[in-house]
């Protein structure tokens, strides 16, 4: 479904719920979220397995482990967004979808479809991980010892704000021009960098689906609300600021004629 530079708030067209484009986009979100969560959570389980087998018993709680987890997430998200961006816009994250909804770049119907697909993809990824690893329990996310829930919430807000800001500047902004080509790479890099910053404090989820899948399959619900509220607040703030303070009004005359129109992505 092609979009334009003009914001369009609404529930969605009557035929959107059954339109083939909606079904294809929803399937793309499901598959890409599955790929991302399987690789991201799988990297944590793999490191834990390696450290336990060598009697180190430290898992990802080392500088090297943190770097490897950040790299795995960055690479997996780069691949997942690249795979879906021409079909669904490559959200792969309920917070990104919420930001696009708040910014008038996606309909309510499409947002609901994406949320369901993202959550199911994350759950299935963790179920298959548990099966493939002979019952290893997904780790998920929790606030580190000595870090309060309020600090964890603030961390998630800031990290997700940065993520959605990069999404907007490279994949949504009508003025982005050729920089849109590197959108998947930029999105993967900011997630990897954010994990290096927030990982030791709250795990740096930035993605409610990424947190929900392991929480459900591993039945680990400690501090779980943070990983919904924080990303949704951070994503919404980034969307509102970028939409109304950075993207020019449709009535504002351009400075030059080389601005590119918004690509036909479903943001």
From Swiss-Prot:
Membrane topology: Multi-pass membrane protein
Topological domain ranges for the Vacuolar compartment: 48-66, 132-151, 200-226
SUPFAM superfamilies referenced in this protein's UniProt entry, alphabetically: Aquaporin-like (SSF81338)
Annotated Gene Ontology cellular component terms: vacuolar membrane
Motif position, NPA 1: 93-95
GO molecular function, one term: channel activity
Alphabetical UniProt keywords: Acetylation, Membrane, Repeat, Transmembrane, Transmembrane helix, Transport, Vacuole
Cytoplasmic topological segments: 2-26, 88-110, 173-178, 248-267
Pfam families in UniProt: MIP (PF00230)
Entry's transmembrane regions: 27-47, 67-87, 111-131, 152-172, 179-199, 227-247
Tissue expression summary: Predominantly expressed in developing seeds. Also expressed in rosette leaves.
Residues with N-acetylmethionine modification: 1
N-acetylalanine PTM positions: 2
UniProt keyword Repeat present: yes
Gene3D superfamilies the record matches: Glycerol uptake facilitator protein
Compartments reported by the entry: Vacuole membrane
Family the UniProt entry places it in: Belongs to the MIP/aquaporin (TC 1.A.8) family. TIP (TC 1.A.8.10) subfamily.
Domain statement: Aquaporins contain two tandem repeats each containing three membrane-spanning domains and a pore-forming loop with the signature motif Asn-Pro-Ala (NPA).
Function statement: Aquaporins facilitate the transport of water and small neutral solutes across cell membranes.
PANTHER family the UniProt entry points to: AQUAPORIN TIP3-2-RELATED (PTHR45665:SF23), AQUAPORIN-8 (PTHR45665)
Protein name (Swiss-Prot/TrEMBL): Probable aquaporin TIP3-2
Organism per entry: Arabidopsis thaliana
Gene designation per UniProt: TIP3-2
């Amino acid at each position: 479904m092609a979009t334009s530079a003009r914001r369009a708030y609404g529930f969605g067209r009557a035929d959107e719920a059954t339109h083939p484009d909606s079904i294809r986009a929803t399937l793309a979100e499901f598959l890409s979220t599955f790929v991302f969560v399987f690789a991201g959570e799988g990297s944590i389980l793999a490191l834990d397995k390696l450290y336990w087998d060598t009697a180190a018993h430290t898992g990802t709680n080392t500088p090297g482990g943190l770097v490897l987890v950040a790299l795995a997430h960055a690479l997996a998200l780069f691949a997942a967004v690249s795979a879906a961006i021409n079909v669904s816009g490559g959200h792969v994250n309920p917070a990104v979808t919420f930001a696009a909804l708040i910014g008038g770049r996606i309909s309510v119907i499409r947002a609901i479809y994406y949320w369901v697909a993202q959550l199911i993809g994350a759950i299935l990824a963790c179920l298959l991980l548990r099966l493939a690893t002979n019952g290893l329990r997904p780790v998920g996310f929790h606030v580190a010892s000595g870090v309060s829930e309020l600090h964890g919430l603030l961390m998630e807000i800031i990290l997700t704000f940065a993520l959605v800001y990069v999404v907007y500047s490279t994949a949504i902004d009508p003025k982005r021009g050729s920089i849109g080509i590197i959108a998947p790479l930029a999105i993967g890099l900011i997630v990897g960098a954010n994990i290096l910053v927030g990982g030791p404090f709250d795990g740096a989820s930035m993605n409610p689906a990424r947190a929900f899948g392991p929480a459900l399959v591993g039945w680990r619900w400690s501090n779980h609300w943070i990983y919904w509220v924080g990303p949704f607040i951070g994503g919404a703030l980034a969307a509102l600021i970028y939409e109304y303070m950075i993207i020019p009004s449709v009535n504002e005359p351009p400075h030059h004629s080389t601005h590119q129109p918004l690509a036909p992505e479903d943001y």
